[in-house]
Amino acid sequence: EMTSSLVGSEMCIRDRDYADMSRKAANIISAQVIMKPNCVLGLATGGTPVGAYAQLVDWYNKGDLDFSEVTTVNLDEYRGLPKEHPESYWSFMHKNLFDKVNIRPEAIHLPDGTNPDAADACKKYNEIIHSVGGIDLQLLGLGPNGHIGFNEPGEAFELETHCVDLTQETIEANKRFFDGNVDLVPKQAYTMGIKTIMQARKVLMVVNGTG
């Protein structure tokens, strides 16, 4: 049984300069891949990590990075969106990173948003994370109200992957990605819990500016 104490180290990059922050985050991720080529990276979506992914792709194109043995697990995925939907996190990750580097498709893991059985989807994702040996480095972008993934502040610390109802604020904020139509915005997501995140051997939190 993995303990939920923070086994490794927690690093936080807080920087108003987005390019600087992205480079620092990419440095830490690339160091992990170089140190342990078959590492397990926990990845996140959103505006904060995009710059870091672009930097990693740049280094990959220069021949400095090799993702052929890397395994990835993503923090979260919308419930009910097909993988290929342009707003799914599966699409986001492929567009910003996976399609541009030599990662093996079978080494890419996200919660299965298409699984209608929430308990089953979460159980399977927890099993995947355990079966790959846990997370070596978990990247987190801190949201504006202090939420990590879709874990809102005050979320129970003992939770692993679980299904969450998105807050009205989150749904409203996401409207712009769905032609302004609130009916099309997913109302739930599958997300790694705080317990899962804290079991990562290293956690890298990236905070851009004040948000």
Residue ranges, per PLM feature:
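Single conserved hydrophobic/aromatic residue that forms the stacking wall/gate
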Residues: 1-8, 13
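Ligand-binding beta-strand-loop-alpha-helix segment within the catalytic cores
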Residues: 9, 65-138
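Glycine-rich N-terminal segment of FAD-binding domains in flavoprotein oxidoreductases
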Residues: 35-61
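C-terminal functional extensions of proteins
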Residues: 190-211
